[in-house]
Each structure stands twice: as structure tokens, then as C-alpha cells.
């Protein structure tokens, strides 16, 4: 506990919180161009081929983003929108591709949880 004298001499130091998504530079989403689209394997107890892409953002940052959902149409030079959100079993992947925005199509034949995968309501 500080004395009043100490508080008069030195004010309290604010805790500085570090951003989990620095490349977004305080924006909710950022646009970028795919420089490489590839698959990678997850950390130890899990096994799969996760679809990821390397993205050069409009602010100059180069980041790795995860492509969620079954199947995608991304290739080099595709223009995409990314959001924050890490993938726990892929080290270094802190961003997600937003499906259904710009060049990235929504997931085909998706019926449930459509809003997360850029799919319109099915006409009956």
C-alpha cells in the first residue's frame, strides 16, 4: 500500500494490455490479398490438414489466416476480408478469413450456423 506522500510524488502506473490481434490495428476487419494458400498440421493430440493462407494486408502486415468450413475457392491473389480469432491448435494463426465476403465464397450446402459461413437463407 502506498502512502499519500508516495502517491503525490509518483502517480499509479497503468497496466498496459497487449493486443492479441496487432495486425488489425484496432479495426474490426481488414482487407488483404492471399500470397499463399496451403494446408498445415495441428499441434500434438490433434491430427488433420487445416486450410490456411498467408495474407498481405492493406496496412502492409503479412499474417496467416485460417479458412473455416468445408471447401473453399481461394487461391493466390484472391482479395479477402479477415477478422481476429486464433486457432488453438495452429501455432501462429491468429486470424480467420470471413466467408462470403469479397472473393471468398460461402460454404456450399450449409444449413445450420449459416451466418458464420456466409450462406444466404434457403428459399423454400
UniProtKB/Swiss-Prot annotation:
The modification 3-methylthioaspartic acid is found at residue 89. The keyword Magnesium does not apply. GO terms for molecular function: rRNA binding; structural constituent of ribosome; tRNA binding. Keywords: Methylation, Ribonucleoprotein, Ribosomal protein, RNA-binding, rRNA-binding, tRNA-binding. GO terms for cellular component: small ribosomal subunit. One of its GO terms (biological process) is translation. It comes from the Bacteria. The keyword Kinase does not apply. With S4 and S5 plays an important role in translational accuracy. Belongs to the universal ribosomal protein uS12 family. Part of the 30S ribosomal subunit. Contacts proteins S8 and S17. May interact with IF1 in the 30S initiation complex. This is Small ribosomal subunit protein uS12. It comes from Buchnera aphidicola subsp. Cinara cedri (strain Cc).
Amino acid at each position: 500500500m502506498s502512502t499519500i506522500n508516495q502517491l503525490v510524488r509518483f502517480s499509479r502506473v497503468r497496466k498496459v494490455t497487449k493486443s492479441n490481434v496487432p495486425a488489425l490495428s484496432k479495426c474490426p476487419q481488414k482487407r488483404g490479398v492471399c500470397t499463399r494458400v496451403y494446408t498445415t498440421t495441428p499441434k500434438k493430440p490433434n491430427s488433420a490438414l487445416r486450410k490456411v493462407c498467408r495474407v498481405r494486408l492493406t496496412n502492409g502486415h503479412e499474417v496467416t489466416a485460417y479458412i473455416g468450413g468445408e471447401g473453399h475457392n481461394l487461391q493466390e491473389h484472391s482479395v479477402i476480408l479477415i477478422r481476429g480469432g486464433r486457432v488453438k491448435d495452429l501455432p501462429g494463426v491468429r486470424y480467420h478469413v470471413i466467408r462470403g465476403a469479397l472473393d471468398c465464397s460461402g460454404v456450399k450446402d450449409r444449413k445450420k450456423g449459416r451466418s458464420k459461413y456466409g450462406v444466404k437463407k434457403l428459399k423454400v
